[in-house]
Amino acid sequence: GRCLVFNPAQLMLDPFGTAADKFRHPATGPADDMHPGWPESTPFVQLPSSAVFPSGARMRLRPLLRSDGHAWRRQRIEDEEFLRPVEPTQTMPWDAAHSQQAWWNHLMYLRTAAREALVVPLVIEVEGQFVGQVTLGNIQHGSIRDCWIGYWVHSAVQGAGVPPAATALEVD
């Protein structure tokens, strides 16, 4: 089969608003040795029924796009009371840390770090909606093969099993 190679910088910046179409289906073909899992979408997984999703829900991971900025900012501002305690290095006012410029800086930092194979930043999407982010970071290549994983999810999906499913998909 034919394997498409995407330029990660173009996908995350998405100047023409078409990048989301490239992630409608999971990637196929051999994984890149330096960038396994990025920029790719995962297959959909079915979340079990819960109080949040009585019939369950479909979830997947995909790369961050410029167009995710509005949802990222809105959800993180709404959930300041949950997120601030676990982000102790945040020194500026919460609204300023989640401005349009802050989103752009965040996206550019992750894009650069992903291109250098140091992180794998992905959006958590449930039923086609942005609900959070999961990131593998400080990726160590070679014999050590180590990293950390971090995530946050919007309060609207807390209790639905999203974080364990997202972290399992991210490390898989």
For the regions a protein language model found, what residue spans apply to each?
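Conserved acetyl-CoA-binding loop-helix of GNAT-fold acetyltransferases
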Residues: 152, 159-172
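GNAT-family acyltransferases
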Residues: 1, 5-156
